UniProtKB/Swiss-Prot annotation:
DNA-binding region(s) in UniProt: 24-43
Claim: Coiled coil is one of the keywords in the record: no
GO molecular function, one term: sequence-specific DNA binding
GO cellular component: cytosol
Name assigned to this protein: Uncharacterized HTH-type transcriptional regulator PF0250
Any one biological process term the GO annotation gives: response to amino acid
Phosphoprotein listed as a keyword: no
Organism (species): Pyrococcus furiosus (strain ATCC 43587 / DSM 3638 / JCM 8422 / Vc1)
Gene3D superfamilies: 3.30.70.920, Winged helix-like DNA-binding domain superfamily/Winged helix DNA-binding domain
Domain HTH asnC-type: 5-66
UniProt-listed InterPro entries: ArsR-like_HTH (IPR011991), AsnC-type_HTH_dom (IPR000485), Dimeric_a/b-barrel (IPR011008), Tscrpt_reg_AsnC-like (IPR019888), Tscrpt_reg_AsnC/Lrp_C (IPR019887), WH-like_DNA-bd_sf (IPR036388), WH_DNA-bd_sf (IPR036390)
Keyword annotations from UniProtKB, A to Z: DNA-binding, Transcription, Transcription regulation
PANTHER family: LEUCINE-RESPONSIVE REGULATORY PROTEIN, TRANSCRIPTIONAL REGULATOR AZLB
Lineage, uppermost ranks: Archaea, Methanobacteriati, Methanobacteriota, Thermococci, Thermococcales
Amino acid sequence: MAELLDRTDKMLLEELKKNARENIAALSKKLGIPRTTVHYRIKRLLEEGIIEKFTIKPNYKKLNLGTTAFVLIRYDPDSGLTQKEVAEQIAKIPGVYEVHIVAGEWDILLKVRAANAEEVGKIVIEKLREIKGVGQTVTMVSFVTIKEEI
């Protein structure tokens, strides 16, 4: 099977990850390829669903959401809901930025953002634990984020 992305596509994606607003002329210069090629490749990557959307990376500290926490959840199979249904309910909670169904000792992993640890606690205690199907939880507050990609 042929590789889906060639070297040029990968370099183009890396540049767009750094700055999705970079114009075609600048990308052409950085990558050493014609502007028409850059335009065509971006169009193809969009059409093939490799690029889903162009987005931003907010500064969460400036948005008063400087505390990141990860929450592990044990699914309660006696709840009458499927694990996916529980995860979909959790995804609706303000402050929950990611919801993953995972393998292992725990069933669901969340990424939560809030102003401080107290606000994270409110999300977990007042919102998350009220959802039918959420069993035991463990919350880990991040001290420092070393790497985070969009």
